[in-house]
Curated annotation (Swiss-Prot):
UniProt subcellular location: Cell inner membrane
Gene3D superfamilies the record matches: Calcium-transporting ATPase, cytoplasmic domain N, Calcium-transporting ATPase, cytoplasmic transduction domain A, HAD superfamily/HAD-like
Keywords from the UniProt entry: ATP-binding, Cell inner membrane, Cell membrane, Ion transport, Magnesium, Membrane, Metal-binding, Nucleotide-binding, Phosphoprotein, Potassium, Potassium transport, Translocase, Transmembrane, Transmembrane helix, Transport
Full protein name: Potassium-transporting ATPase ATP-binding subunit 2
Binding site for ATP: 376, 380, 407-414, 426
Composition bias type Basic and acidic residues, residue spans: 7-23
Catalytically driven reaction(s): K(+)(out) + ATP + H2O = K(+)(in) + ADP + phosphate + H(+)
EC number in record: 7.2.2.6
Main location: membrane
Gene Ontology terms for molecular function: ATP binding; ATP hydrolysis activity; magnesium ion binding; P-type potassium transmembrane transporter activity
Length: 708
């Protein structure tokens, strides 16, 4: 097989972009799914709506044969008409509940379709052990295979760059048009995702996932999980609704016996006609209407939609949640563990000043700093070289004979071993002090003065040395992102504690923490400290959220109740987390807490509204059953007739479900209030509103209906 330097462009898929949801098509599919969900095996999953489903079947049967459960006391044709109307309204009640769930599911499936569009059946060039290339289909690739990708070709699978540097277009996944530079040697920049496109140069990639197990495949399976497992709070609420439904079912089931008892008393006191009128008011269809009106059908019909919509709102932030449990956990978070760099401050710290110590000059510091940064390709390292060049410093070193020393979290320094045997280093001040002492050197007193000066300015001090002598301190300027103080204050009002982790010294960390407005901070933190902080918070009964992108973050991401991994991060980090941010913006963790709380607030608000509705429906239907028993005074709405009261209450009960679908999908407007303030506000708006709204609506429907 030939080994061309430029491989032929043989993908069978053109560049894809995430499409906008086709709302018309979404609603058409949702209407179709509403009928599919009428299947008993699907309907039984929602106990509240299943009662309505069974009630619809029963009222349909008594429409066909009004005497099915006993002789009808009223006019049989009028009874058949009433039964038919009740059946129709109950049918649409179930259909509207199915539609709400189908719309929420459809939005998730639309996202899955957009992710599927990034997958393409591509040709891969596999690098054989002898160095030659073999053309195979991407589905034949296996974990550990090495492939070659060139400019304009689609990357056929998830992998790690082991050779080459190139720009990759990840817009099909992230929506971000700016290309991302990929190169070997770092956790972040070496990770590539199948379905993205290489824009320039060539890359040698080692495949890290078998077909069907890549990042996109896993995300699709998660997003398509319409049959998702319910969250603990959702299960608890479902159980509560089921218990309420059973209570009302027992009450309504015993009502015929109670009515017969009263009818016998009325027959003796007022005659048989009054007794028969009372019995007619307790027909099977009317009792089912009372049951449907009393059970919490509104929240029962919207509960699944609220949960699915919560995941969809997260997806609109370009974040993939592995489960509804993760989204819900965001709302219960008590502590946020945040990295300083990239989350609280902008990621790229820039060299701003060289501060000489130990009688050296600024030029001396610039020269040593530049030598220590010759192999440092980070933005910080490049900014040090750029600042040194302002002093006309030339690095007269043969790079082929010099040796770069990479930064590590353990040593907390990097540098260069020069051809003449000298060692130049830059790094955290205490790390450089340790390096000097290990070589028998001494620490000049003005190092601490420079250290404190930079720290008090909120910058990061890096010491530079050659062998056993410190030459000076580099001032790396760090800028806190705007608006964070206000957002942290909002979180504080909601009872969420913010903890900043940084490798900076205590003074610098204190200045940054005060400027950003975080509640607590850990200075000179190592990656291992993250998991210790999380465990400490969890031992106090708190739920913890954190972000991470590197392999060393994976244990902490797995330990956290909510772990948000960056899409630009390593495969290990993404597998350990329960959320992945496609935009790789760690600040989004704050937004996710808001979304989680909004989900819980929406569920609670609509539950309150649904249960409060029962009061008005109670006063609409109950007087129609016991009117002959002399409790017509309970008809406080002045409804025209028994038939009008029943139909009005059921129409309202059905229409309120589609009316609340937008609120269920978009969520209740979030306000950063304390738990007590939120409770009082929701009881006032959705509790009191849930009582008043049906009184008004049922009366208006009664006025419009032609019953007399």
């Amino acid at each position: 097989m030939r080994s061309p330097s430029r491989l032929p462009h043989e993908t069978r898929d053109s560049r894809q972009r995430t499409p906008k949801t086709d709302m018309r098509g979404l609603y058409q599919r949702a209407i179709k799914e509403s009928f599919v969900k009428l299947h008993p095996k699907i309907a039984v999953r929602n106990p509240v709506m299943f009662i309505v489903w069974v009630g619809t079947i029963v009222t349909f049967l008594v429409t066909l044969n009004p005497n099915l459960f006993g002789t009808v006391q009223a006019n049989i044709n009028q009874q058949r008409l009433l039964n038919g109307l009740i059946t129709l309204i109950l049918f649409f009640t179930v259909l509207f509940a199915n539609f709400a769930e189908a719309v929420a599911e459809g939005r998730g499936k639309a996202q899955a379709d957009s992710l599927k569009a990034t997958r393409s059946d591509t040709i891969a060039w596999k690098v054989l052990p002898n160095g030659s290339l073999e053309k195979i289909g991407s589905t034949q690739l296996r974990r550990g295979d090495v492939i070659k990708v060139v400019a304009n070709d689609m990357i056929p699978g998830d992998g790690e760059v082991i050779q080459g540097i190139g720009s990759v277009d990840e817009s099909a996944i992230t929506g971000e048009s700016a290309p991302v530079l990929k190169q070997p040697g770092t956790d972040i920049a070496s990770s590539v995702t199948g379905g993205t496109r290489l824009l320039s140069d060539e890359l040698i990639i080692r495949i890290t996932a078998d077909p069907g197990q890549g990042f996109i495949d896993r995300m699709i399976s998660l997003v398509e999980g319409a049959e998702r497992s319910k969250t603990p709070n959702e299960i608890a609420l479902t159980v509560l609704l089921a218990v309420l439904t059973q209570v009302f079912l027992i009450v309504v089931a015993t009502m015929p016996s109670f009515v017969n008892y009263i009818a016998n008393f009325i027959s003796t006191a007022f005659g048989a006609e009054a007794a028969n009128s009372l019995r007619a008011g307790a027909s099977i269809a009317i009792l089912i209407s009372l049951l449907v009106a009393l059970i919490p059908t509104t929240i029962g019909g919207l509960l699944s939609a609220i949960g699915i919509a919560g995941m969809d709102r997260v997806a609109q932030f370009n974040v993939i949640a592995t489960s509804g449990r993760a989204v819900e956990a965001c709302g219960d978070i008590n502590s946020l563990v945040l990295d300083k760099t990239g989350t609280i401050t902008f990621g790229n710290r820039m060299a701003d000043e060289f501060i000489p110590v130990n009688s050296y000059t600024v030029e001396d510091v610039a020269r040593i700093a530049k030598l220590a940064s010759l192999f440092d390709e980070t933005p910080e390292g490049k900014s040090i070289v750029k600042l040194a060049e302002k002093y006309k410093i030339l690095a007269d070193v043969n790079l082929n004979q010099a040796e770069g020393v990479e930064f590590s979290a353990k040593t907390r320094m990097s540098g260069t071993n020069l051809p003449n045997g000298k060692q130049v280093r830059k790094g955290a001040v205490d790390a450089i002090k340790g390096f000097i002492r290990s070589r028998g050197g001494s620490i000049p007193s003005d190092v601490d003065v420079a250290y404190e000066r930079v720290s008090l300015l909120g910058g990061t001090p890096l010491a530079v040395c050659q062998d056993n002598e410190i030459f000076g301190v580099i001032y790396l300027k760090d800028i806190v992102k705007s608006g964070l103080r206000e957002r942290f204050e909002q979180l504080r009002r909601m009872g969420v504690k913010t903890i900043m982790l940084t490798g900076d010294n205590h003074i610098t960390a204190s200045v940054i923490a005060q400027e950003a407005g975080v509640d607590d901070f850990i200075a000179e933190a190592t990656p291992e400290d993250k998991i210790d902080v999380i465990r400490n918070e969890q031992s106090q009964g708190k739920l913890v959220a954190m972000t991470g992108d590197g392999t060393n973050d994976a244990p902490a991401l797995a330990q956290a109740n909510v772990g948000l991994a960056m899409n630009s991060g390593t495969q290990a980090a993404k597998e350990a987390a329960n959320m992945v941010d496609l935009d790789s913006d760690p600040t989004k963790l704050i937004d996710l807490v808001t979304i989680g709380k909004q989900l819980l607030i929406t569920r609670g608000a609509l539950t309150t509204f649904s249960i409060a509705n029962d009061i008005a429906k109670y006063f609409a239907i109950l007087p129609t059953i016991f009117g002959a028993a002399g409790i017509g005074a309970l008809n406080i709405m002045g409804l025209k007739s028994a038939q009008s009261a029943i139909i009005s209450a059921l129409i309202y009960n059905a229409l309120i479900i589609p009316a609340l679908i937008p609120l269920a999908l978009q969520g209740v407007k979030f306000r950063s209030l304390t738990a007590d303030q939120l409770l009082r506000r929701n009881i006032f708006i959705y509790g009191l509103g849930g009582i008043i709204a049906p009184f008004i609506a049922i009366k208006l429907i009664d006025v419009i209906l032609p019953f007399s």
